[in-house]
Amino acid sequence: MIRTQDISVCTEGGSIQQKKVSDLKNRVQMVERTPNALLLSIHQNYFPEAKYHGAQVFYAKTPGSEALAALLQQTLRTCVDPENHRREKPAEAVYLMEKVSCTAVLVECGFLSNEQEAEKLTQAQYQKQLTGAVCSALCSYLETEGESQ
């Protein structure tokens, strides 16, 4: 599934909370029905304090996830922000990451709560840098993964 709009895949009816839960469950089902799936979830981060910045990658406990996350984190550092010293981390309490059986990562591209980073995240050139880094890392991972199978 590639989203180009902010849409929900929830089951109709119910409260807002029930819709959020059904949306997540339906996403898991979509991933699980897809042969040879790989989940790449891309987000923008937010934290109440504006001092935090930098892209960070989180990974599921499934095979290949940590390796992909490490490659993504390193590529984002190299291609986008050499001063970013964040490290990839396990995704704790993230429903999708806990429920899927495929390789799965969540990329937080930056902090909307940091004024300077929020500004960069709206710029087309910076967005191209981010997507280029993510695509490069993903292609490298898939090439390496293909060789190991």
Positions of the model-derived regions?
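Stable alpha-helical elements in mature extracytoplasmic
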Residues: 20-27, 65-68, 72, 117, ...
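Active-site-adjacent mobile loop/cap segments within catalytic or ligand-binding domains
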Residues: 34, 41, 48, 85-149
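Peptidoglycan cell-wall recognition and remodeling modules
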Residues: 10-12, 18-19, 83-87, 108-109
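Active-site/binding-pocket entry motifs
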Residues: 7-8, 78, 112-113
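Active-site-adjacent substrate-binding region
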Residues: 64-90
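Catalytic-core regions of hydrolytic enzymes
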Residues: 1-67
